[in-house]
Amino acid sequence: MATTLTQSAHASNAGATTQTVALSGVGKGHLLSLVVFTGNGVATASVTDSQGNPWIRNADAYASGSLGVEGWNASGAIGGNTTVTVTLSAASATDFTLVLMEFTGPPTVNAMDQENAN
């Protein structure tokens, strides 16, 4: 079965430490993928959602005082309306953007195949 992007949503917030993004009608067993872009190279402390899906950080890259980017996945989603909450590790607020995607067709376990960084 081919992997297909089912739906996506994004949210941006200036000067925050917590932010949410939501998808409606997520299919049971689908893959949820989240990309977090942060200002000032701030890392993400936690990713949780309203359905209790377990989130795993797959990749990250940071430039001190500049940009941070992280990739997170929740394989085998419980399904239903899902609101994802991201909390940053920094006590001070920064600008950050979330991109949340739902995919059908990928494996429901061990969805992360490989990571490469330079």
Stretches with model-predicted labels:
Residues 1-118:
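Function-critical acidic carboxylates
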